[in-house]
From Swiss-Prot:
It comes from Homo sapiens. The modification Phosphoserine is found at S10, S446. Disulfide bonds: none annotated. The keyword Phosphoprotein applies. Changing P632A: Found in patients with multi-locus imprinting disturbance. This is Inactive protein-arginine deiminase type-6. PANTHER family: PEPTIDYLARGININE DEIMINASE, PROTEIN-ARGININE DEIMINASE TYPE-6. Gene3D superfamilies: L-arginine/glycine Amidinotransferase, Chain A (3.75.10.10), Protein-arginine deiminase, central domain (2.60.40.1700), Protein-arginine deiminase, N-terminal domain (2.60.40.1860). Keywords: Cytoplasm, Cytoplasmic vesicle, Disease variant, Nucleus, Phosphoprotein.
Amino acid sequence: MVSVEGRAMSFQSIIHLSLDSPVHAVCVLGTEICLDLSGCAPQKCQCFTIHGSGRVLIDVANTVISEKEDATIWWPLSDPTYATVKMTSPSPSVDADKVSVTYYGPNEDAPVGTAVLYLTGIEVSLEVDIYRNGQVEMSSDKQAKKKWIWGPSGWGAILLVNCNPADVGQQLEDKKTKKVIFSEEITNLSQMTLNVQGPSCILKKYRLVLHTSKEESKKARVYWPQKDNSSTFELVLGPDQHAYTLALLGNHLKETFYVEAIAFPSAEFSGLISYSVSLVEESQDPSIPETVLYKDTVVFRVAPCVFIPCTQVPLEVYLCRELQLQGFVDTVTKLSEKSNSQVASVYEDPNRLGRWLQDEMAFCYTQAPHKTTSLILDTPQAADLDEFPMKYSLSPGIGYMIQDTEDHKVASMDSIGNLMVSPPVKVQGKEYPLGRVLIGSSFYPSAEGRAMSKTLRDFLYAQQVQAPVELYSDWLMTGHVDEFMCFIPTDDKNEGKKGFLLLLASPSACYKLFREKQKEGYGDALLFDELRADQLLSNGREAKTIDQLLADESLKKQNEYVEKCIHLNRDILKTELGLVEQDIIEIPQLFCLEKLTNIPSDQQPKRSFARPYFPDLLRMIVMGKNLGIPKPFGPQIKGTCCLEEKICCLLEPLGFKCTFINDFDCYLTEVGDICACANIRRVPFAFKWWKMVP
């Protein structure tokens, strides 16, 4: 490059000094210039002194020299000698800083030559919240900004996905380069600051290019606020735009950009996005290409979607508006009041089956140091939906995202309902501070086997922070793991315990209970005695005595099969979650094998599937120590349901309050049980996901 004075200015990383005339160079803050000290040394030179001006740091033989110091170093002339030079701040004018090297012969008092390097320091940097404290700070290590490191001692900036419900189904038009962003939305975006400083006569000869790769530009958007102090922001980087040129007009440029992700990590997207600013010199000769003189890079990681176990404190209960059955809403509302939770109604969605609220949606959250956002992740089973009423039911500040599914059959396992999250666990020395995602699967290849689609499975694995565990659930009609297991919170974590218990469905425990009651003389007590005949008929059930249930060999064989399936999962859970038998409570529950209902004949498999014989006790609403449990309508012993009594005996000594909810009118129908009629938003983990090491 040529300066305004016509002197040759160098951006080279190695500078060769001259005794005949000064050398001029530009040094970008954060970079080093290597000086060849021996190349121009006079013959018979035996030593040299070197010093620099106030903004220059010099390193010779691992000795750092500042303005106040001179270093006299003896060095054989035959050995190449180098010094590294760095600038500590930008220069106020061209050639405002310098390095002088004076050479001496055998007589140290008589210098035999002097070489001078004039320096012009400029700053070109991109800065982000690299230290994850919510503040944009200048990094002392330029190379560190190019990496993203997990763990408590790690570093690297974080991006949040735009989960604004208003943007669901909407795409920013390719040609639309302006967007109004309100002040409350700004807090969701991550800041990226561009700093450029130096003499204007130097800077104006270059241009700055802010850029990313074409692939990464599809995963995030970068906005630049307009100068009119309005809420209008210019889209400078995003889908179909991976580079943006800024003009350098003055001696100081400081601009803040706002960045949002538009996709969570997935099989095709690692979650890492890098942005660079390049200082580009345009050639005066048309035959010579432009030259990139310097590039600074920062790396963001898109915050993962974190799923929340039912052991976390509840905040808000969402209920299907069309399911306001007699007593149901009142009971759930009372439960919510006991746990200081709000109740919200959800708009009816005529395009989706009644189970959609819980089976196809999950409350989760995403988090950066500056912001935590709760959101609904929706995996709609109905294809080609044009509208999503759920997004209009959410409380302010709650996000909404759609994760497409592939299998849209009625009995599909390809939905977020086929997922549960364990509380935090430690397994063989490995900690999972955010718990582990539990996925229902078919476990082995089968012509009729069902499983979560690869797309959804890969999405769950790609989040990295809740290492998935696959369970065998294809034996269930719904295929969902929450039909045979549930976690409840305990207060004993500080006493060396895990802080939770695992409840597992147990047909054998149910048969044991019924045999006990039979021996006590209650064999004629009726299951479903409290229900009307039309209720039983609509659900394919009939009232039976304990004697009849115990004499039903077919039902017994069906439950022996179910017991084997649950036992397989029990072993997996003990291994993968580090559980022991004392962490597990067996809940009496019977199942029966049936064909799928309400599905087209071409989707009907040959085999039968298990479904709860009476309302599933495991499908409870967990609200701290308050449990909303489906009323099982078990045999009445002295006016008390023996199943309810058993549950209370198991759980109430541990401090739980059991409320049994009559939801039989939606049991086994398209609606399902109470868990499918409600979904709960919970408190996010206190632990920050970036402090773990996957």
